[in-house]
Amino acid sequence: MKQFYRSHFWIAAGLAVAAPVVCLAAKEFSMPKAQPAFSFPAHDHHSNENVTVAVDPYDTPAKEGIFVVKYREHELLPILLIITNDSDSPIELADMKAELVTSDRTKLTPDSEDDIVRRISHPNASGTRYPVPFPTKKAKGGVNSKQMDEIQSAQFRAKAVEPRSSQIGFLFFDVSDIPTPLTGARFYLTGVRNASGNELMYFEVPLDKYLNSQRPQ
């Protein structure tokens, strides 16, 4: 009887240890469900064109949980960009340019795919790194295939927004040496064009709107 209980104990212990590894191995990135831009605290609505732009920083451990890559450990700030077109005509994003301007007027542009891969492949020596408990397949420059899939699929890539619809995706900003990148910062979006090819007025989103919404009421 004692042998029976000992066997079951070790089986249970083995399953308890293996479960986190299996969960970690199975985790994959899934883009958040698209919500209208005006539903986010930090947004700018252009009533003339009926277009709204919003940003939602993923700056907390809870929100960062959707990712495979721990971007904050690599001093990268993911910001979800949401563009909602409530007009009757499509808008074009092919010439769109995004910029994050910090409180000290430092201008940041989104990192490219290669920039992100380079940062993750060659982390700063001072950063804390945790060993992965199982072998992984490398895809590009020290980034495994699951990480590479996420980097490619998470980024905002839409070239247009159809009428009565929204497009979303992440922009990744290098915030190394910037302790509080969001406080007093403003997000600018230019190069959005209407169906006639005319450029819309630039969008300006104060990030303090987001920060204020996170404070306890």
PLM feature segments, named:
Residues M1-R6:
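N-terminal secretory signal peptides that target proteins for export/translocation
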Residues W10-P20:
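Bacterial N-terminal signal peptides
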Residues V21-A25:
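Sec/Tat signal peptide C-region and signal peptidase I cleavage site
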Residues A26-A34, F40-P41, K97-D104, P133-Q217:
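Surface-exposed edge beta-strand/loop patches
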Residues K33-R72:
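Low-complexity, acidic Ser/Thr/Pro/Gly-rich terminal tails and inter-domain linkers that flank the onset
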Residues K63-L76, D86-I91, A160-E162:
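Short, solvent-exposed beta-strand/turn "edge" segments of beta-rich domains on protein surfaces
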Residues R72-L80, Q167-I168:
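Short, solvent-exposed loop/turn segments enriched in Ser/Thr/Gly
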Residues P78-A154:
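Mid-length scaffold segments of soluble, non-membrane domains
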